């Protein structure tokens, strides 16, 4: 399902997101024929992660892209398809001053961020504020850490 889906998305990206690069994260569980095909596409960058384990944390590899300096990043699952609605909403976001963007694929999706499209630009996750207990009334209530460091703790 995912290998077929990424092929379909790579082909559709040429139509919906002309000029964009599709970054595909994978490990050794993906058939080499699929990887060879992906490497031949002019709109694909393949990112290899060693190993053969199918772990839940593999789904977090995509978040590494959010820390590419000065990049505009859109993320979605390989089993989700692009749509005219999505492209219109992404264009509206790019024309706005907002740094973060979320699209829910269905009106009943109530989780803050699902596998539908989300985007980040202007290095908006370079530093993430984490609430810290107040030691005294004059202390700063938020500690900022590098977003990449926080992500590395979960992968």
Q: Which stretches of residues belong to each language-model region?
A:
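Short aromatic/hydrophobic "clamp" motif used to bind/position activated sugar donors
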Residues: 73-75
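Catalytic core and acceptor-binding pocket of nucleotide-sugar-dependent glycosyltransferases
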Residues: 107-110, 117-155
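Conserved donor-nucleotide/metal-binding helix-loop-beta segment in metal-dependent transferases, i.e.
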Residues: 82-113
């Amino acid at each position: 399902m995912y290998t077929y889906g990424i092929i379909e998305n790579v082909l559709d990206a040429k139509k919906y997101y002309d000029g964009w690069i599709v970054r595909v994260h994978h490990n050794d569980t993906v058939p080499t024929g699929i990887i060879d095909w992906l490497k031949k596409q002019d709109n694909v960058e393949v990112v290899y992660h060693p190993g053969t384990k199918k772990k839940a944390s593999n789904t977090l590899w995509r978040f590494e892209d959010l820390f590419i300096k000065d990049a505009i990043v859109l993320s979605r699952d390989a089993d989700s398809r692009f749509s005219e609605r999505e492209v219109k909403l992404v264009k509206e976001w790019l024309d706005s001053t907002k740094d973060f963007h979320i699209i829910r694929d269905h009106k009943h999706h109530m989780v803050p961020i699902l596998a539908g499209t989300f985007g980040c630009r202007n290095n908006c996750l370079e530093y993430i504020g984490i609430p810290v207990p107040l030691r005294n009334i004059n202390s700063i209530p938020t500690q900022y850490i590098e977003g990449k460091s926080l992500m590395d703790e979960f992968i």
